[in-house]
Amino acid sequence: MTSPSIFVEVPQAQPVLVFKLTADFREDPDPRKVNLGVGAYRTDDCQPWVLPVVRKVEQKIANNSSLNHEYLPILGLAEFRSCASRLALGDDSPALQEKRVGGVQSLGGTGALRIGAEFLSRWYNGTNNKNTPVYVSSPTWENHNGVFSGAGFKDIRSYHYWDATKRGLDLQGFLNDLENAPEFSIFVLHACAHNPTGTDPTPEQWKQIASVMKRRFLFPFFDSAYQGFASGNLDRDAWAVRYFVSEGFELFCAQSFSKNFGLYNERVGNLTVVAKEPDSILRVLSQMQKIVRITWSNPPAQGARIVAFTLSDPGLFKEWTGNVKTMADRILSMRSELRARLEALKTPGTWNHITEQIGMFSFTGLNPKQVEYLVNQKHIYLLPSGRINMCGLTTKNLDYVATSIHEAVTKFQ
């Protein structure tokens, strides 16, 4: 008799919701189907878009006989790390000029978050202090909870962010949570285009947030996944991070180049570290190097080369910013068109929040029954939270989606 597998007691994990949604969409034979769940840019033909500047740089790399496939340094491609941190902080950043900034190339934004979380769990607020509270917004990108718990943090809390009644930022709730958090707590902040709500604090509100965080000795860990992709303006989307640096904060900023370069499967990320003096950066990076060594050891080169080539060449950089604006403008257009159609249909409720939000996602305010109706009856795939990816909308499906939302809201109040 054969003995049972040693893995017989391993339970089946639940699928990752957003990827299951895409799998269900692909298997659906209905010709009307629309995927509003995918977290990637799509053209008006609902196709992935390789940025023209990326195509150009890929060709340059392919034709460069001096490049090879040797290991990159553990911390990554130096030119990429430098360019990425400069993009986040700005060319005129005093922190850069004073050499108190460091970067770690990572496997996407998730990898940057994980390296930062692993470092903080070992060296922040006391050695190996896994009890430091980590605050994530309510709601947030679901991976934030998993990354910090996976790094060993035992006390992950939520802070007020979304006001469902007014469909906007709950600033007072946010500030109250900052005031009541234990000193030295870690706060995960969305640099721009908050996921999933698409609602960001204004500069004045960010100043209030920073003021309380400074007084309470709270540590800002920014997640910057959409720089340039949110408003179409790189500097505007980096405003919050740069303001915190100007206020003297030490901070981490996890950067992703998946969205603004369209390099989803290249996994290009960077963890920017800002400290108070250069010596601290050297020591922090030395410890991060040890963490990277036992995580992925050395990062991949292709995506980092594409980003570094583009950001370091004035002509390519200008072309890239144009490509980014093309994507941002299409999203803004879809927001305006969807709102206009819902208001023309006199769909119950208010829909101004759709155009007031920014970035790839809109937190529609649709309830679970309305979402269930859209998925099961109308073949429009979106998350149970009501979050939709504006890139899934096109001039061809806008009328169908708007009419379907109108039906869902009318049937299920």
UniProtKB/Swiss-Prot annotation:
Superkingdom in the source lineage: Eukaryota
GO cellular component: cytosol
GO MF assignments: L-aspartate:2-oxoglutarate aminotransferase activity; L-cysteine transaminase activity; pyridoxal phosphate binding
One Pfam family per UniProt: Aminotran_1_2
Modified residues (N6-(pyridoxal phosphate)lysine): 259
Alphabetical keyword list: Acetylation, Amino-acid biosynthesis, Aminotransferase, Cytoplasm, Phosphoprotein, Pyridoxal phosphate, Transferase
UniProt catalytic activity: L-aspartate + 2-oxoglutarate = oxaloacetate + L-glutamate; L-cysteine + 2-oxoglutarate = 2-oxo-3-sulfanylpropanoate + L-glutamate; (2S)-2-aminobutanoate + 2-oxoglutarate = 2-oxobutanoate + L-glutamate; 3-sulfino-L-alanine + 2-oxoglutarate = 3-sulfinopyruvate + L-glutamate
Biological processes per GO annotation: aspartate biosynthetic process; glycerol biosynthetic process
Classification via PROSITE patterns: AA_TRANSFER_CLASS_1
Primary location recorded for the protein, binned into one broad class: cytoplasm
InterPro entries given in the database record: Aminotransferase_I/II_large, Asp_trans, NHTrfase_class1_PyrdxlP-BS, PyrdxlP-dep_Trfase, PyrdxlP-dep_Trfase_major, PyrdxlP-dep_Trfase_small
Required co-factors: pyridoxal 5'-phosphate
CDD domains linked: AAT_like
EC code(s) of this entry: 2.6.1.1, 2.6.1.3
Residues modified to Phosphoserine: 149
Function: Biosynthesis of L-glutamate from L-aspartate or L-cysteine. Important regulator of levels of glutamate, the major excitatory neurotransmitter of the vertebrate central nervous system. Acts as a scavenger of glutamate in brain neuroprotection. The aspartate aminotransferase activity is involved in hepatic glucose synthesis during development and in adipocyte glyceroneogenesis. Using L-cysteine as substrate, regulates levels of mercaptopyruvate, an important source of hydrogen sulfide. Mercaptopyruvate is converted into H(2)S via the action of 3-mercaptopyruvate sulfurtransferase (3MST).
Miscellaneous note of the record: In eukaryotes there are cytoplasmic, mitochondrial and chloroplastic isozymes.
Subunit organization: Homodimer.
NCBIfam families named in the record: PRK09257.1 (NF006719)
UniProt protein name: Aspartate aminotransferase, cytoplasmic
Organism of this sequence: Equus caballus (Horse)
